[in-house]
Amino acid sequence: MDILEILQDDYRKFPNDQTYSLYADDVYFKDPMTEFRGCDRYRQMIGLIKTWFLNPQLDLHNIQQTGSNIRTDWTLSWTTPLPWKPNIQITGWSELTLNEAGLIAAHIDYWHCSRLDVLKQHFGKF
């Protein structure tokens, strides 16, 4: 399988059984909530999603590669473990940059909504 096929499979299985070997040891990650370096930290972040989100799902809408850049368009959804169990949805895209070894050296996520919009989804019923 090539990297696009592996990523498609990872999205389908998310957050379980991710292929961390695709990522450089010092991978740079950034999204509207956090920013860090390191594959171990990336693993921990996915672990937190598995622990704190109910029924997380990452739907891949599009994936394309141009040279050393990969763009994915997606929707992340989950249920937050609050008494009223709000369903949360974020649409966005990721820009991945491959290093010379073909590993993901940077993974930057962008959202089509603000952090406040995500917070409001948690309390929309009140």
Regions found by a protein language model. Give the residues of each.
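C-terminal and inter-domain tail/linker signature
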Residues: 1-126
